[in-house]
Amino acid sequence: MSGAGSKRKNVFIEKATKLFTTYDKMIVAEADFVGSSQLQKIRKSIRGIGAVLMGKKTMIRKVIRDLADSKPELDALNTYLKQNTCIIFCKDNIAEVKRVINTQRVGAPAKAGVFAPNDVIIPAGPTGMEPTQTSFLQDLKIATKINRGQIDIVNEVHIIKTGQKVGASEATLLQKLNIKPFTYGLEPKIIYDAGACYSPSISEEDLINKFKQGIFNIAAISLEIGYPTVASIPHSVMNAFKNLLAISFETSYTFDAAEKFKSAAAAAPVAAAPSAAAPAAAAKKVVVEEKKEESDDDMGMGLFD
């Protein structure tokens, strides 16, 4: 290795070591067909909230091995280091970095021999191609017609499917039509967070909900088996307080917090008494009136006996 090459290697190792020891959150992404200018734009976009490391996987793995004693959790990354791997280091804003990455995508022509990342459909309508090129389209089994001195495609054409290898004829046609069917950018494959790896499709909200559910499950199990944990202690304290309060109501034993509840309970019947008196008086009046009517009927019947 030349002196210049050795120097570049040492600079890369020093930079990578600093990044791996500074950050605990990372996005591991594939960088196929991502150019240097595009990568530079991504670096500029995330400046202040993250950093980008692009290099050979053998070099990155060497740095991870060298840090095995101080940061053994980094070994989880080795599984995801591929040929064209880019690592984006983040602070506490993975969602923002992912958003920036998604906006930094550029259109690209279809090149022969490339596997299509998405379907390619040519719409029906004018092509701008001269009638002399009709045979070229016919070889691709595309129905055409001549309209106003140019070739029109009769029906929509599904020319390339996802995962299909792009042929030379398809690539030439798309170039003639000035269609750039593919977009390329960094493709996040895994999120690394302090030794844990998960899919980039999982949002921070999903993680928070899972965390809450885990705490709930731990608390439930702890309460069931009577084994105190940080998650169950608040519930245990509340249950103990309720039991103590119940004992205070049934016995002469009391304490400051119980007195507040006792005072509230004692005031409740007093407040309800005036409202309860009115229905009782009304009911009494109805009973008296009914008895009075019965007495009148008896008196009337006696006059005609």
From Swiss-Prot:
GO biological process, any: ribosome biogenesis
* InterPro entries, A to Z: Ribosomal_protein_uL10, Ribosomal_uL10, Ribosomal_uL10-like_insert, Ribosomal_uL10-like_insert_sf, Ribosomal_uL10-like_sf, uL10_eukaryotes
Q: Where are the transmembrane segments?
A: none
Q: Name one GO molecular function term.
A: structural constituent of ribosome
Domain of life according to the entry: Eukaryota
| Keywords from the UniProt entry | Phosphoprotein, Ribonucleoprotein, Ribosomal protein
Instruction: Kindly provide the PTM information from the record.
Output: Phosphorylated.
The signal peptide, as residue positions, is none
| GO CC list | cytosolic large ribosomal subunit; extracellular matrix; lipid droplet; phagocytic vesicle
- Task of the protein: Ribosomal protein P0 is the functional equivalent of E.coli protein L10.
Q: Fill in the subunit field for this protein.
A: P0 forms a pentameric complex by interaction with dimers of P1 and P2.
Q: Which family does it belong to?
A: Belongs to the universal ribosomal protein uL10 family.
**Protein name listed in UniProt:** Large ribosomal subunit protein uL10
Species: Dictyostelium discoideum
What is the taxonomic lineage of the source species? Eukaryota, Amoebozoa, Evosea, Eumycetozoa, Dictyostelia
Gene symbol? rplp0
